[in-house]
């Protein structure tokens, strides 16, 4: 094992025996996908055959599959459940030019390729790949795997290494991993980990958010809108909510730099059923907000030793850039053209005026996505702890009315107007009981304004998810959000904005003798 090999490796794994080599190959196979290239090298007896056989068998999902050496055939191709697997040995290759004759690029474009003797290809292989070199451990006891990622695989290898270290440290290294359905996030994903005894946990994969293009005064949209840029915000809010006695997930382990968290699995029981909101569960979620909003809350929360998270303010700049999403994405989606400069300026001026009273009102922790996809019913617990909370990393210091509107005008399921009104009344009564100074009429105005702001924003977000992110299934929710917005614009506090929507989005705001779109 040369000093150069060790110095260049991004990850060095000690493999004490034959079984450890096979186990490592199986775990590495979980990380590979169609189009990946893995190059494998090492001296005679270093364990290449053992490693390659275990890797191919795992990828093919056939534990007893025969995996002969491709030394004389150059390539062996296997059918996998997700994609083909190409196992190649280039020892007999004369040069990289022969890959063209073999049709290598076409053969491996949608396959996982494992190549032994990659140096014989003379640099003709994809530069984005994972290189694994096996060698004898010092003293001849076991083997050592030296892994290096090149090109785009360099960052992937760092995440793989961080994940393996995290689950090993937390005692979850042998758990089965199941991907979970993706949410509206373009950078965050989840996996459910299941141990042999049935115990489960969730892996939250939330790498640092890449800086987007500047959109205003040199700042990207995410910074202006106060969206979390690292996993630190989730950790801080999680600890803060748990300290108040709420059912946020316990964090078993973390790698803050990699953006990996191993967290408690709160379950899958929702607050809705096939008919829509379950009133008793929505009522309990409403009471949770009453308790949160009636509590004096810190603005700075600890993340870990020496690191704190300051909850950002939900300021005018953030609120306005959110409503602009309607102009940027929803209007072109519905009307087919952009707003004129004057129409856009009027829109922003009216929203600035409407939000003025919000900005001087009381603030609290605004969790921001407090609605059915992020609320889990935990019947085995008692009281407010039956409401499990997730997806609160974008929390800001904002108006109490925002999260109430987020819940009672749920973006993913229609909340009937009578249930909405009943739960608004529940919230107002219990806030008033906790604090006689609570201003019910001011809250009602704030609710209408923030519900309209949120609906306006979401119309833009769902149109953007379709056009920019290739997620058209969010468009099915537009009629519901439109109906909510119509409901909100009926409040006198939004009279001027209602005229604007009637003028520039007549499809959205019908004439008084027309029937509004159903939810």
Please place each PLM-identified region on the residue numbering.
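Short phosphate-coordinating micro-motif centered on Lys-Gly-acidic
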Residues: 2-6, 11, 105-163
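Conserved nucleotide-sensing/catalytic segment adjacent to the nucleotide-binding pocket
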Residues: 67, 71, 75-117
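ATP-binding glycine-rich phosphate-binding loop
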Residues: 170-196
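Active-site acidic catalytic loop and adjacent metal/ATP-binding pocket
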Residues: 187-194, 203, 292, 352-402, ...
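ATP-binding pocket architecture of kinase catalytic cores
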Residues: 193-325, 331-332, 360
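An alpha-helical support segment within catalytic cores of ATP-dependent transferases
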Residues: 297-312, 317-318, 322-366, 379-381, ...
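Active-site activation/catalytic loop segments of kinase-like enzymes and analogous catalytic loops
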Residues: 325-334, 400-436, 452-468, 481-489
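ATP/Mg2+ or Mg2+-diphosphate-binding catalytic cores
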Residues: 458-519
